[in-house]
Structure formats: C-alpha cells, structure tokens
Design a protein with these regions (language model features):
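Conserved, mostly hydrophobic/aromatic
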Residues: 22, 31, 115
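Short glycine/serine/threonine-biased micro-segments
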Residues: 24, 68-69, 116
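N-terminal [4Fe-4S]-dependent radical SAM core
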Residues: 1-23, 28, 36-40, 155
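Conserved Radical SAM active-site core
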Residues: 2-9, 36-95, 101-107
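Auxiliary Fe-S-binding modules of radical SAM enzymes
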Residues: 7-16, 60-61, 78-80, 91-155
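Hydrophobic pocket-lining residues within nucleotide cofactor-binding pockets
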Residues: 27, 73, 120
Length: 155
C-alpha cells in the first residue's frame, strides 16, 4: 500500500492532457537536489481504488489523465492502481512518473499510457531541459512506447 499527500491539476507534465497529479510519499530514490523532498517520508493517506474513484468523481469531465508522481517503493501496487483505472474509468489515461532508470520487469508497461523514467540529476535538469537524463514515453501499441521528451523542452 502506498500513501499520497496531495493532488493538483497540472497541464505541463503530460502533453495534450489535463492531468490530475497524485503526489505519492515514501520515495526511496532520494535524488540529490530533489524539489519534492517532503515526499521522501511515508506520510499522508492511503491511496486506494476507493480514493481514486473519489478523485474521478470530484473532477468528472475536467481531467483526461491521472498521473502517479512517485510510487517507486511499490511499483507493483502502482501497476495495480493503473489496471483498476483502465478497467473502471477507461476514458482516462494513466501516467507514472518514476525515478527508476528502467521500467520494472515485474509489471506490464501496457498498464500505462505515459511513463517518465529517470532520477532527477540536478546538473542535467528536469524534463523541460534538453540536457536531461529523464525521458517521457507515450504508449504507441501494445508494449511499444515512443520517446516524447522533446515535446517538453523549452523553446
């Protein structure tokens, strides 16, 4: 089980989507220079399918995507939540921002429509910087994903 601390509607994290961002706590990555160090501690409320249903009801018609920000402490649970959302709320896309270098082999990529991989490395910058090590992928077909990171770069 994972906990979340807060949520927010965001427009930049996933291109062409109005995204409900869910900040998951207990991050094991501990990236130096992290701008969300408050998410390192395992605090907040349990993130359950019932909580997701409430978010969807609260933002009905306003969001097109739900993004799990973190969850690296339990990727299998993040995948289960993604499966639940696709089954119960098929109109929504599901994204996962992970600090991992690679996608965990123990879960299915196709449970997600978007996946961000890579730890934050301060001197390389975040996704909007051309120098970033992080990558944002969009599902193309099946388990195939296309790198769309360049869509986030500052012009």
């Amino acid at each position: 089980m994972l906990n979340y601390l807060n949520t927010g509607i965001v427009f930049q994290e996933i291109p062409d989507e109005v995204t409900l961002s869910i900040n998951i706590t207990g991050c094991p990555c501990r990236c130096p220079g992290c701008h969300s160090q408050y998410l390192w501690e395992n605090i907040g409320e349990p993130l359950t399918p019932m909580v997701l249903d409430q978010f969807v009801a609260n933002y009905h018609g306003e969001i097109t995507c739900i993004c799990f920000m973190g969850g690296d402490a339990d990727p299998k649970y993040v995948s289960q939540l993604a499966q639940y959302l696709h089954r119960e709320h098929p109109q929504l896309k599901v994204a996962w921002y992970s600090g991992r270098q690679q996608f965990p082999r123990t879960i299915r990529k196709r449970d997600f429509d978007y996946i961000k991989l890579g730890p934050y490395i301060e001197h390389l910058g975040c996704l909007k910087e051309r120098t970033t090590n992080q990558r944002l992928y969009k599902r193309a077909a099946g388990d195939d994903f296309t790198d769309i990171t360049s869509r986030l770069w500052k012009k």
